UniProtKB/Swiss-Prot annotation:
This is Disintegrin trigramin-gamma. It comes from Craspedocephalus gramineus (Bamboo pit viper). PANTHER family: ADAM A DISINTEGRIN AND METALLOPROTEASE DOMAIN, ADAM METALLOPROTEASE. The disintegrin belongs to the medium disintegrin subfamily. Belongs to the venom metalloproteinase (M12B) family. P-II subfamily. P-IIa sub-subfamily. Monomer (disintegrin).
Length: 73
């Protein structure tokens, strides 16, 4: 939601302060296909495997989301 860095609905998230919905100091992310142990996964890590004649999607190293491969048809 607006103003929140992470989902504070789960107090078990080790990257998020459940009271403030803000990332803990040193954490880059709290969730997402390209977030691993509170850090962005390195650029080029596959975050979504291809299905059919689709292409793999890769982490970009600067966000927790899994951006769509720009070469998709």
């Amino acid at each position: 939601e607006a103003g929140e860095d992470c989902d504070c609905g789960s107090p078990a998230n080790p990257c998020c302060d459940a009271a403030t919905c803000k990332l803990l100091p040193g954490a880059q992310c709290g969730e997402g296909l390209c977030c691993d142990q509170c850090s962005f996964m390195k650029k080029g890590t596959i975050c979504r495997r291809a299905r059919g004649d689709d292409l793999d999607d890769y982490c970009n190293g600067i966000s927790a989301g899994c951006p769509r491969n720009p070469l998709h048809a």
